[in-house]
UniProtKB/Swiss-Prot annotation:
<dbReference type="InterPro" id="IPR001915">
    <property type="entry name" value="Peptidase_M48"/>
</dbReference>
<protein>
    <recommendedName>
        <fullName>Protease HtpX homolog</fullName>
        <ecNumber>3.4.24.-</ecNumber>
    </recommendedName>
</protein>
<feature type="transmembrane region" description="Helical">
    <location>
        <begin position="145"/>
        <end position="165"/>
    </location>
</feature>
<dbReference type="GO" id="GO:0006508">
    <property type="term" value="P:proteolysis"/>
</dbReference>
<dbReference type="InterPro" id="IPR050083">
    <property type="entry name" value="HtpX_protease"/>
</dbReference>
<feature type="transmembrane region" description="Helical">
    <location>
        <begin position="7"/>
        <end position="24"/>
    </location>
</feature>
<keyword id="KW-0812">Transmembrane</keyword>
<dbReference type="InterPro" id="IPR022919">
    <property type="entry name" value="Pept_M48_protease_HtpX"/>
</dbReference>
<feature type="binding site">
    <location>
        <position position="134"/>
    </location>
    <ligand>
        <name>Zn(2+)</name>
    </ligand>
</feature>
<keyword id="KW-0472">Membrane</keyword>
<feature type="binding site">
    <location>
        <position position="203"/>
    </location>
    <ligand>
        <name>Zn(2+)</name>
    </ligand>
</feature>
<keyword id="KW-1003">Cell membrane</keyword>
<dbReference type="GO" id="GO:0004222">
    <property type="term" value="F:metalloendopeptidase activity"/>
</dbReference>
<keyword id="KW-0862">Zinc</keyword>
<feature type="transmembrane region" description="Helical">
    <location>
        <begin position="174"/>
        <end position="194"/>
    </location>
</feature>
<feature type="transmembrane region" description="Helical">
    <location>
        <begin position="29"/>
        <end position="46"/>
    </location>
</feature>
<feature type="binding site">
    <location>
        <position position="130"/>
    </location>
    <ligand>
        <name>Zn(2+)</name>
    </ligand>
</feature>
Length: 300
């Protein structure tokens, strides 16, 4: 089912990409956009996870350097009944995390240095479980493809500023100044709306399943509250440079969108916390974090 959703998404984003190309360069622009889109579809399926990790400067965690963290992730993956994903660390003080990969067998979880410093081991377990839920649900390919295409559509729309008003070799003049300006605004907005629809619909489900994986909904609820508060005060420079990836994070890392609920990439954090607290009232509780002592590990 995950591949079906991803195929539909690729078709929608490809159509949007072709539309932008046609508006910029008429028939020739559409043909060029089609060729680019075909290449992007292949690239995003096989390599988009590595591209996103590279955008954020993530480096793979050595199990010997952070055994407690590594064992925590492995224990949660075992509890979720899925393969152990690769584990990456992002060197930023903002607490946050995301998952990526085309399927559970080829997946990665990336956490920030700020997350490991600001949260308790229990809260980190809640966050990791949320990301594992995205992987198990096969949301990660969907979100990574969206991020790649949204960024490309935004760049293509910006090209319209330079080429949109000029005539092509057939004498066509697809866009004037007004059309160019409209395209620069509307194309990224359309891509962003697709991102928002996907992220909002999947976050609640990942919260629910993540809480089941770690066995303590309140661990994740507490983590979300801390991350939300700190993310609004601490910069994530690489996320600001790559806003198309914002919907992949557990909490929106962008300051500019933090209070804009109309165009938010995530559901309201207070509502997510309330849902987890309601879940905790009737849920059986796990007694400990999988395979890790109840202390701060050597990952600070």
């Amino acid at each position: 089912m995950g591949y079906v959703r991803t195929g539909i998404l690729m078709a929608v984003m490809t159509a949007l990409f072709l539309g932008v190309g046609a508006l910029i360069g008429g028939q020739s622009g559409a043909i060029i956009a089609l060729v680019i889109a075909a290449g992007m579809n292949l690239f995003t399926f096989w390599n988009s996870d590595r591209a996103v990790l590279s955008m954020h400067g993530a480096h793979e965690v050595d199990p010997r350097a952070a055994p407690d963290l590594y064992n925590m992730v492995r224990g949660l993956a075992d509890r979720a009944g899925m393969p152990m994903p690769k584990l990456y660390l992002i060197e930023t003080d903002q607490p946050n995390a995301f998952a990526t990969g085309r399927n559970p067998e080829n997946a990665a979880v990336a956490v920030t240095r700020g997350l490991l410093r600001a949260l308790t081991p229990e809260e980190v377990a809640g966050v990791v479980a949320h990301e594992l839920a995205h992987i198990r649900n096969r949301d990660t390919l969907l979100m990574t493809v969206t991020a790649t295409f949204a960024g490309a559509i935004s760049m293509l729309a910006n090209f319209a500023f330079f080429f949109g008003g000029s005539s092509n070799e057939e004498g066509e003049r697809p866009m004037g100044l007004v059309g160019t300006l409209a395209l620069m605004f509307l194309a990224p907005l359309a891509a962003g709306l697709v991102q928002m629809a996907i992220s909002r619909s999947r976050e609640y489900e990942a919260d629910r399943i993540g809480a089941e994986i770690c066995g303590r909904p309140l661990w994740l609820a507490s983590a979300l509250g801390k991350i939300e508060g700190l993310a609004q005060r601490i910069d994530n420079v690489r996320a600001e440079r790559n806003p198309a990836t914002a919907h992949m994070f557990i909490v929106n890392p962008l300051h500019a969108m933090g209070h804009d609920r109309l165009f938010a990439t995530h559901p309201n954090t207070a509502n997510r916390i309330a849902a987890l607290r309601a879940m905790a009232e009737g849920a059986p509780q796990a007694s400990r974090i999988p395979r890790v002592a109840a202390r701060r590990g050597p990952w600070n």
